[in-house]
Amino acid sequence: MAVSKQVIATEAITRKVDLDNPKVVAKLKKNMGHMTYGEPAWPNDLLFMFPVVILGTIGVIVGLSVMDPAGVGEPADPFATPLEILPEWYLYPAFHILRIAPNKLLGIALMSAIPVGLLFVPFIENVNKFQNPLRRPVATTVFLIGTLVTLYLGIGATLPLDKWVTLGLF
């Protein structure tokens, strides 16, 4: 007898606690977490894990700032124009698209393609209903390609035009 995927999925979702098992009943009476496994989130997470994570984060930030402090740049000169004016780091990919486009119309078209592409993200995400990224190959591939292109354009924006294709490596 073949069991359909729908029956297996429904059975996995509607799984009930085995109240005939005395070990399970004992754990539930001691309030040992949800269903039959784990430990309660209160007070363990709030009283132990949160302070450890907060103190660890503060320690990492202080350690990095002591080991490698941010250097102070040259003083500003209001009468000298910088050699190359760059936008903030989060605008590097868009700036680089405009910089490498051969004409203004193509640059505007490429810039408008970014939000149009983002409009299609929900439709790409709904191709597959799984939550695991390894079982959603279309969405994972689109995300990885988009991330790599954005990083490539962002790094290339900081380089001169003759070196951006190879990112200055060759």
From Swiss-Prot:
Bilayer topology: Multi-pass membrane protein
A biological process term (GO) from this entry: photosynthetic electron transport chain
Pfam families: Cytochrom_B_C (PF00032)
Chief location of this protein within or outside the cell: membrane
Subcellular localization(s) per the UniProt record: Cellular thylakoid membrane
Transmembrane stretches, start-end: 46-66, 105-125, 141-161
Function, as annotated: Component of the cytochrome b6-f complex, which mediates electron transfer between photosystem II (PSII) and photosystem I (PSI), cyclic electron flow around PSI, and state transitions.
Family named by the database record: Belongs to the cytochrome b family. PetD subfamily.
HAMAP family recorded: Cytb6_f_subIV (MF_01344)
Name of the protein in question: Cytochrome b6-f complex subunit 4
Organism, as annotated: Synechococcus sp. (strain JA-2-3B'a(2-13)) (Cyanobacteria bacterium Yellowstone B-Prime)
Gene: petD
